[in-house]
Amino acid sequence: MAENKTENPGTEEMEVRLAQLNQFTRRTLTQEEVFLFDVRLCDNEIDRDGERFSLEALEQLKTLFVGKTGIFDHNPKGENQTARLYAAELVQDPERITAAGEVYTFLKGHAYMVRTDANRDLIREIDGGIKKEVSISCAAASQTCSVC
C-alpha cells in the first residue's frame, strides 16, 4: 500500500532522506527533483495462501529491500522500473493482533521517484490513493508449518 506521508517532512528529516536516496544516484538530487512516498511491503499476517512472514524474516528483509527497484507487473524491463527503495523500517501496531497471536508488524519501505513529465500522472494517482497496492516477489528456502 502506497502512503504519501513523506512528501513534506521537516527540513532536518528531508536532509536525512535525501542523503539516504542519493546513495543510489549518479548525482545529488534535490528535494524539488524527487517524489517521496511510503509503501507497505509485507507483514506477519497470514495471507490468502495461508502463509506469513516471521518477525525474523521481516527483520532480514528490512535490509535486503533497500536499494531495490519498484517495477510494474513483476516485469523487470527497463520501462517498468518506476521507483527505488532508499530505506525500510519495521512498524508495529500493538492494537492489532495477527491470526497467529503476534503483534501486527509490517515492513514499510521508503521510496523515491525522480519527477518527470512522464510520471506526473502516476504521482497524482499515488497522491490521490488510486495507486496504492504493491506486491513483492520472493522465494523461501524452506517453509515451516505452524501446526505440525
List the model feature ranges, each with a label:
Residues 1-148:
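Signature of dsDNA virion morphogenesis modules
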